């Protein structure tokens, strides 16, 4: 019951964030390009492959995968938000890609045929799933033997200060505690050893990992604030049930902390992600 409640809450928060995420998708795509490229390579996304993309969002990494696999390949974009998937379809049509289809639902309960996919990918979604181990196990069943999944997650609060400090501010104003270990959260899978243990517990082997610095560069802190308020569902959700006066005060303080990351050339937010991959045993 608890997992179902979490899933419903996650669906609600991302349906609400979908328009903002789609608006900022080009910025997010540029920001995460090094991580996306590494993820696709580590998952062995090659020409002609059948790829499952979990938590696709508006689909910039879906389209990157679709270009890699070519006309003989195929990418299934899956997301808990049907609105997100509408954006995936629109974005694919806009660039003339016809090898993308969508599948709505929580990653833990996807209706996919066993052993049909050559690769699985998930960029910045796994740490926010209600049951990440269950989601990975579902992907393992969907993969052909000897095939891989690769994911991107944020590492630690220390290495992602422009994201960690605003979250701390929002939680404090809302009177809420950070998610306890094992619960969905921005940094829940980023500590040393966590992803490897999760992959192994989910039945994967030959786990590979690499950390990447992915600083967010924008013209100014105001742009970073707008993106955070409009697109980051986990941040929006923290104060969504707070009185307006609390929300206003919280976001005002967030704006002030984001300004501390401005330089002479604009906003630069230090960020780090972990790209991890696991192999389904042959």
What are these regions (language model features)?
Residues 69, 91-92, 170, 199, ...:
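Conserved hydrophobic residues forming the short capping helix/wall of the S-adenosyl-L-methionine
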Residues 2-49, 60-64, 84-87, 94-95, ...:
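Conserved class I S-adenosyl-L-methionine
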Residues 43-45, 69, 143:
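A generic alpha-to-beta junction signature in SAM-dependent methyltransferases
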Residues 108-119:
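A short acidic, Gly/Pro-enriched loop at the edge of an enzyme's catalytic core
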Residues 133-134, 140-219:
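Conserved catalytic/acceptor-binding region of the Class I
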Residues 50-110, 134:
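Class I SAM-dependent methyltransferase SAM/SAH-binding core
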Residues 118-133, 155:
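A short SAM/SAH-binding and catalytic strip from SAM-dependent methyltransferases
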Residues 2-10, 24, 28-32, 60, ...:
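Conserved Class I S-adenosyl-L-methionine
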């Amino acid at each position: 019951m608890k997992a179902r409640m979490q899933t419903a809450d996650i669906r609600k928060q991302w349906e609400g964030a979908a328009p903002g995420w789609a608006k900022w998708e080009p910025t997010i795509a540029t920001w995460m390009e090094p991580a996306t490229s590494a993820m696709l390579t580590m998952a062995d996304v090659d020409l002609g492959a059948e790829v499952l993309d979990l938590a696709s969002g508006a689909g910039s990494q879906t389209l990157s995968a679709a270009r890699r696999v070519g006309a003989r390949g195929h990418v299934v974009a899956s997301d808990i938000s049907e609105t997100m998937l509408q954006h995936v379809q629109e974005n694919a049509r806009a660039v003339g890609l016809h090898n993308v289809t969508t599948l709505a639902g929580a990653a833990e309960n996807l209706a996919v045929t066993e052993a049909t996919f050559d690769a699985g990918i998930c960029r910045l979604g796994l740490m926010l799933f209600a049951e990440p181990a269950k989601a990975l196990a579902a992907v393992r069943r969907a993969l052909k033997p000897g095939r891989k999944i690769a994911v991107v997650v944020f590492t630690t609060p220390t290495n992602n200060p422009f994201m960690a400090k605003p979250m701390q501010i929002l939680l404090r104003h809302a009177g809420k505690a950070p998610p306890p270990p094992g619960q969905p959260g921005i940094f829940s899978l980023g500590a040393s050893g966590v992803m490897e243990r999760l992959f192994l517990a989910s039945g994967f082997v030959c786990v590979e990992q690499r950390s990447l610095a992915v600083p967010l560069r924008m013209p100014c802190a105001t742009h970073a604030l707008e993106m955070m308020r409009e697109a980051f569902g986990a941040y929006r959700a923290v104060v969504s049930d707070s009185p307006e006066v609390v929300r206003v005060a919280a976001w005002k303080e967030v704006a002030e902390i984001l300004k501390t990351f401005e330089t002479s050339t604009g906003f630069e937010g230090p960020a780090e992600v972990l790209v991890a991959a696991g192999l389904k045993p042959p």
